[in-house]
């Protein structure tokens, strides 16, 4: 409802679900602060930035304390700071017992929030299950290292597919998780290893493999 003010829109949904206007107004002020919405409750929704409009949409959805929520791309238009704000509030709702279904292409958000996920390609399910179990099912075929060992020494190990720069370290892709033992032995030859993280692929990487590349 773009032509309504923030207050008018939120009050409409709150009263629609049986909430008293006085309670809803007090709750709206609280949510405006919690989500750091820029503007006044008398501002029209159409005048808000995309990010602030997204926050108001969430407030309209949760102000009456629903037990079941469906959120469609809740982090669209938000910068990292505001994404974190929204994510924390969604986590809080989850902790309070709300059942939440949300669709998103933000795999980082999915990984942080979801206990269970379903990935679709052209309307067909390609993956479904507990988030951690899905990640582990792909094997621990990636290693992040911060070490002076050369790319050539790493690539000489049978089972190392690639070595790519990542931040101040490097990402090593393996054919098999067991190759990680040899990589560690090579990296540890000089003694101290600042960082060695042998992990399962992220959901973002799995998404690219299964959905975009499938």
Predicted regions and their residues:
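Structural motif detector for alpha-helix initiation sites
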Residues: 6, 131, 200-203
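A generic structural signal for secondary-structure junctions
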Residues: 9, 15-18, 57, 118, ...
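Generic structural signal for individual residues within well-ordered alpha-helical segments
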Residues: 10, 25, 32, 84, ...
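Structural motif corresponding to alpha-helix initiation and N-cap regions
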Residues: 42, 53, 128, 148, ...
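ABC transporter nucleotide-binding domain
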Residues: 87-174
């Amino acid at each position: 409802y773009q032509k309504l003010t923030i207050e008018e829109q939120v009050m409409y949904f709150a009263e629609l679900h049986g909430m008293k206007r006085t309670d809803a107004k007090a709750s709206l002020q609280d949510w405006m602060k919690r989500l750091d919405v820029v503007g006044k409750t008398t501002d029209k929704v159409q005048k808000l930035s995309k990010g602030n409009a997204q926050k108001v949409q969430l407030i309209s959805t949760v102000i009456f304390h629903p037990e079941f929520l469906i959120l469609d791309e809740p982090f669209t238009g938000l910068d990292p700071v505001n994404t974190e704000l929204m994510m924390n509030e969604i986590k809080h709702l989850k902790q309070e017992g709300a059942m939440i279904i949300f669709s998103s292409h933000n795999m980082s958000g999915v990984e942080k929030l979801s206990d269970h996920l379903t990935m679709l390609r052209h309307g067909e399910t390609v993956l479904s299950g507990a988030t951690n179990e899905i990640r582990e099912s792909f094997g621990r075929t990636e290693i992040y290292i911060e070490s002076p060992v050369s790319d050539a020494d790493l690539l000489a190990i049978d089972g190392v597919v690639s070595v790519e720069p990542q931040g101040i370290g490097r990402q090593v892709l393996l054919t098999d998780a067991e190759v990680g033992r040899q990589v560690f032995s090579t990296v540890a030859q000089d003694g101290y290893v600042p960082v060695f993280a042998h992990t399962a692929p992220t959901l973002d990487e799995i998404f690219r493999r299964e959905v975009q590349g499938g």
